[in-house]
């Protein structure tokens, strides 16, 4: 289009050559839009000074062909460009980033024997071929960042856990553009797993069921753990929220330990080495609560994990204490390193009412005698597949009186139940988690943000 406008202006200059020389900009082929208004103002002056009739005609002709349409088109393009996110987040992320060009995560170079990967041409070629799945991961990571950064400002003491969980989940669904109510819609994009809101001695896997009246108080330590997925690429990240600065050292211990684990991670690195690095950092911290100095302990039976396609726990575990697993990380794998610190025993057990569930990828085919179990299994398969879900999600989809059928699926080994995991009462636990991918040339910490 720009070329066409330039030709029109050049023709006008030739027509007007008897009254005024063509501008140097037009002769040199510069963009006409920058000089269009200047040329028209010159023509107006000539008309006022009694320029010949031919000159007036040329001036009028030029004014008629003034490239207003181009300006209008530019304005329309601006109106249809990137939008600004709202609070609470409700603008689809592909409207904030209309070209599907999402921010890259934090890049960490490989070290020691893997340092050559940064400059190796073959590895760089492989890296360039991975853009499709990385775009999906980065999209999910950006949604996670925008939702959690809003949530950290929004959550206040006295708010109910149900309100908090639904606020986060509604925001994720709005940004993905998938409400998860139609068959299969939740498997296209949306929640990677239910929002965990585990308070104080409860370390993980707690989300409110229907009718829950719990609130978060000023003196509480709440772990906020939620996932976002795009076409089964799950971004898993968690932070600990407090209102009382007395717990800062507990939170800082987990953040530092998670960063140490990510730094140690890499292709061909043994899981046990990562666990040792995490424990060394975590247990170097202490926290003073109510006048008592307490050591921060790793919760030794909680781990990080690999992430598979539509599978939050991909088969490999990343310990947060030394010893144990000698399995190595491999190129192309995605991991969530999550660390848990505790002022209690540093060991969790199943406790409280179960809310988290997931269908097993290798679920056995067994005869179900409870009719509600058959109906529920069909719905779970269509709507969640192997993605974790909670009872609130079943309520939201219109299921009722499903608990007998759900328990039947659990006892049959088709669905796995994930009860809350708790340390001793009176203790405080914290969590920090990031998702990263082992690219051929570097580690990309997908979920890294300005907040953590």
From Swiss-Prot:
Chain positions recorded as a divalent metal cation 2 binding sites: 236, 305, 338, 433
Region annotation (Disordered) ranges: 1-100
Binding site for a divalent metal cation 1: 225, 236, 433
InterPro entries: Creatinase/aminopeptidase-like (IPR036005), Met_Aminopeptidase_Type2 (IPR050247), Pept_M24 (IPR000994), Pept_M24_MAP (IPR001714), Pept_M24A_MAP2 (IPR002468), Pept_M24A_MAP2_BS (IPR018349), WH-like_DNA-bd_sf (IPR036388), WH_DNA-bd_sf (IPR036390)
Compositional bias (Acidic residues): 37-51
EC number: 3.4.11.18
One Pfam family this sequence matches: Peptidase_M24
Broad class of the protein's primary localization: cytoplasm
GO BP term, example: proteolysis
Cofactor note: Binds 2 divalent metal cations per subunit. Has a high-affinity and a low affinity metal-binding site. The true nature of the physiological cofactor is under debate. The enzyme is active with cobalt, zinc, manganese or divalent iron ions. Most likely, methionine aminopeptidases function as mononuclear Fe(2+)-metalloproteases under physiological conditions, and the catalytically relevant metal-binding site has been assigned to the histidine-containing high-affinity site.
Catalytic reactions of this protein: Release of N-terminal amino acids, preferentially methionine, from peptides and arylamides
EC class: hydrolase
Localization per record: Cytoplasm
GO MF terms, alphabetically ordered: initiator methionyl aminopeptidase activity; metal ion binding; metalloaminopeptidase activity
Cross-referenced CDD domains: MetAP2
Family label: Belongs to the peptidase M24A family. Methionine aminopeptidase eukaryotic type 2 subfamily.
Name of the featured protein: Methionine aminopeptidase 2-1
